[in-house]
Amino acid sequence: MAVTTPDWLKQREGELQVHKDGRSGSVYFAGQLQYVLMPMPAKGKFACRISETINGRRLDGDGIYPTNEDALRGGLEELRAKLGW
């Protein structure tokens, strides 16, 4: 199953664009790139690195996920929580 833009992001006029490699994604608000999510190997599974593009600040959570897709979905949820939504 492909990773799609979650409802909470759509409600705020945001968009997820999964990169052509299918392994990472970018979050846009009002057409402007705001965050990059990149699943990374962690403890034999995957974690998600979340970077704010305007200043490079990292917003990573501590979730570990079984697959790359799950890490991308989990990273979106971690981002939602960090943003207080």
Regions found by a protein language model. Name each.
Residues 25, 48, 61-63, 74-75:
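Small side chains
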